[in-house]
Amino acid sequence: MGLENGIQLIMKQKIDLDDWNIIPEYVHIEFDEFNTNEYKDGYYYDICYWRKCSCIRDSILNNIFNEYNSAGGIFEIDKPNQIEQIQDILIYHLLNPEAWRSAIWTLDEACRNIAQCIINLTWLKNFMAEHLGVKVIFYDSF
């Protein structure tokens, strides 16, 4: 089971606070700045994070990256529709409790985080459209 899985935005420069604009569809939701880690090659922003949710991990690896029985790794999200596909996977798991398996969390415990990830991915799509050439990865520490 993948221990740490998530999506990161990698930038050479720190994101200007003006870029943390509210998404029109979600005006009533407060956006905090994403967790940021600074490394020698830039800033890593945690857009989404799952811990020990292999049902989500497996769906993303199998359906988007054609990776079956993956031993982990870093996978670049470089096609425009991949963000929507990940959102669809998250929505599917929220709406289909029978699909929720192999996780240390119950769906009730995880649903708030999953919903926030869906919103964060909408922000990411908008950000990527305005900032061409940014790097986005799905990481899996299996």
Model-derived regions: residue spans:
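Acidic (Asp/Glu-rich) sequence patches and key acidic residues
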Residues: 1-134, 141-142
